Amino acid sequence: MGMRMMFTVFLLVVLATTVVSFTLDRASDGASAAADLVARGIRGNCCMFHTCPIDYSRFNCP
């Protein structure tokens, strides 16, 4: 393989890695947002009770 061919293959690998990484990052952001909404729903219903902040301190109830 010549130097140009090796450089071209290197650039293609870098481009493919960047595209895959960007796509996976966007997908994980959506999953994180969905998990945050679920957690907010749990916290909202849970913390109406006066003992909830003590019992469920891991949820950071206000």
From Swiss-Prot:
GO cellular component terms, A-Z: extracellular region; host cell postsynaptic membrane
Tissues and organs where the protein is expressed, per its UniProt entry: Expressed by the venom duct.
Cysteine pairings via disulfide bonds: C46-C52, C47-C61
Signal peptide: 1-21
UniProt KW keywords: Acetylcholine receptor inhibiting toxin, Calcium channel impairing toxin, Disulfide bond, Ion channel impairing toxin, Neurotoxin, Postsynaptic neurotoxin, Secreted, Signal, Toxin, Voltage-gated calcium channel impairing toxin
Propeptide: 22-40
A Pfam family matched in the record: Toxin_8
Note: The short (45-61) amidated synthetic peptide shows very low or no activity on rat alpha-2-beta-2/CHRNA2-CHRNB2, alpha-2-beta-4/CHRNA2-CHRNB4, alpha-3-beta-4/CHRNA3-CHRNB4, alpha-4-beta-2/CHRNA4-CHRNB2, alpha-4-beta-4/CHRNA4-CHRNB4, alpha-7/CHRNA7, alpha-9-alpha-10/CHRNA9-CHRNA10 nAChRs, when tested at 10 uM. It is also non-active against L- and T-type calcium channels, as well as on voltage-gated sodium and potassium channels.
Task performed by this protein: The short (45-61) amidated synthetic peptide inhibits the rat neuronal alpha-3-beta-2/CHRNA3-CHRNB2 nicotinic acetylcholine receptor (nAChR) (IC(50)=1.16 uM). It also inhibits Cav2.2/CACNA1C voltage-gated calcium channel (IC(50)=398 nM). In vivo, when tested in rat pain models, this short amidated peptide increases the pain threshold.
Comment block on domains: The cysteine framework is I (CC-C-C). Alpha4/8 pattern.
Family: Belongs to the conotoxin A superfamily.
Name of the protein in question: Alpha-conotoxin Vt1.27
